[in-house]
């Protein structure tokens, strides 16, 4: 795998990953890949692997920037990694087996730009890039 602007985040078992990469005409792709780098699913939204967690074979949690248009105006992932851009995220639970997309957080306040998602019991933990504090959301 050698796509331009590529970022990959692997599941804790190393069998699945989430890949962000540049495509033609200043567009980007975000997809689920296997351990050979083969696309298993393409998502209709854009986000970065460090804003997601693969928690099981068909469960993914993602913080997704609400303003998807920003991806056409900036250079990614460079601007993001250099902290030149911050997002206002919605947080979602994705069930690939049942093709479900459940909203966990979509409030206007506080501003959330979530990274480093982890599960602890029935809580989704993450760091908010705005203040570098630990936050949590109840999950089912």
Language model: regions and residue ranges:
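Multi-bladed beta-propeller domains
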Residues: 1-6, 32-48, 95-112, 140
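Hydrophobic beta-strand positions in blades of beta-propellers and related beta-sheet-rich domains
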Residues: 8, 27-33, 62, 89-93, ...
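Residue-level marker for isolated small/hydroxyl-bearing positions within beta-strands
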Residues: 19-20, 63-65, 127-129, 137
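Short, solvent-exposed loop/turn segments at conserved positions within beta-propeller repeat blades
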Residues: 22-28, 82-88, 130
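Active-site/pore-lining binding-face segments in mid-to-C-terminal subdomains
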Residues: 29, 35-72
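Short, conserved, GDST-rich strand-edge loop motifs in beta-rich repeat architectures
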Residues: 64-86
